[in-house]
UniProtKB/Swiss-Prot annotation:
The gene is crh-1. This is CREB homolog crh-1. Transcriptional activity is enhanced by phosphorylation. Phosphorylated by cmk-1. Expressed widely, including in head neurons AFD, gustatory neurons ASE, the olfactory neurons AWC, and in the ASI sensory neurons, as well as in the intestine and gonads in hermaphrodites. It comes from Caenorhabditis elegans. Interacts with CREB-regulated transcription coactivator homolog crtc-1.
Length: 327
């Protein structure tokens, strides 16, 4: 009974290491499978060299496109700026004698839109607006509509910018030196003709006086139309404009030095071309040497062939002589 108890007590002790070994083996097998699966997942997640190169190329393209997408700075005047420049000089407070369409320029304050004729000429006579101002501003739509209408001269065909002389004299042209002043129409003309003449003269004078300080151009009279136009100094050869710093900066940024990636690629290409040239020179030199060596060998072989032929001839002659002597 004691021995059986001892065996029964020893059996679990003896079998426990085997079970532990089996359990460890199973655990290691499971761990190895998990590790293999984990490694496969990591390898799948890890980007390949092709993906890395693709990312680098896209980054280079983005860097190249960034300076190209920046638009060059423009110096064009906006319509609001143009409208602010085209506004007439500040008006004086209206009096009982002044009409809504008549502006009396003050002699104390100088107008910011001064003409080359001087402020004294403009201050002597009132400036006539052919249209009623809208909210204190000049009505540009009405001015454009009036300018598009044909100009009618009552005294017949105009000559040298003046209306033909019927009964009431001619309309003074812009060569008189006063642009945009009130025009005295002939007495025989109708009210619609007077209004058209005043609108044309007033519009041309206002636009001319407003555009002169902005564009820096001189007034030129055209006798065919009886209005003032502007001749740009660029047509006479005296125009010279300095580029703005924003434009020069944009052009330097756009077409200046290449980027770092382009510089590196150009340098590598030049190095590759130099290496190719050196290799081609070396190849040609070796080819010439090889051809010379072959020519030398051919000449040596030809000389040896000649010597062997002569030796063969002498041997034949000796052999023939011996045969003759033996017979």
């Amino acid at each position: 009974m004691a021995t059986m108890a001892s065996t029964s007590n020893c059996s679990p002790v003896a079998t426990s290491p085997l079970m532990m070994l089996l359990f460890k083996a199973l655990q290691e097998g499971g761990d190895s499978e998990d590790e293999a699966r984990r490694r496969r997942e990591q390898l799948n997640r890890r980007p390949s060299y092709r993906m890395i190169l693709k990312d680098l190329e896209t980054a280079d393209k983005v860097m190249k496109k960034e300076p190209e997408e920046t638009p060059p700075s423009s110096v064009d005047a906006s319509p609001l700026q143009f409208q602010s420049v085209m506004r007439p000089p500040p008006t004086a407070p209206p009096t009982s004698a002044a009409t809504p369409n008549r502006i009396l320029p003050s002699s104390n304050a100088a107008s910011p839109y001064g003409s080359p004729l001087g402020s004294s000429i403009l201050s002597n006579q009132p400036l006539v607006l052919p249209f009623a101002p809208i909210n204190g501003d000049f009505d540009f739509s009405a001015a454009i509509a009036a300018a598009s209408q044909p100009k009618v001269f009552p005294g017949g065909p105009q000559q040298n910018g003046l209306g033909g002389g019927g009964g009431g004299g001619g309309v003074p042209g812009p060569s008189s030196g006063i642009a945009g002043m009130s025009v005295q129409p002939p007495t025989s003309s109708t009210p619609s003709q007077q209004q058209s003449v005043q609108s044309l003269e007033g519009t041309s004078g206002l636009i001319g006086s407003a555009m002169k300080p902005m564009l820096g151009i001189d007034a030129v009279s055209f006798p065919e139309f009886g209005t003032t136009d502007w001749q740009s100094p660029m047509l006479s050869g005296g125009y010279s404009s300095s580029p703005s710093p924003t434009m020069t900066g944009g052009s330097m940024r756009m077409g200046g030095g290449p980027l770092h990636g382009e510089d590196e690629s150009n340098r590598k290409r030049q190095v590759r071309l130099l290496k190719n040239r050196e290799a081609a020179k070396e190849c040609r030199r070796k080819k010439k040497e090889y051809v010379k060596c072959l020519e030398n060998r051919v000449s040596v072989l030809e000389n040896q062939n000649k010597a062997l032929i002569e030796e063969l001839k002498t041997l034949k002659e000796l052999y023939c002589r011996k045969e003759k002597d033996g017979m």
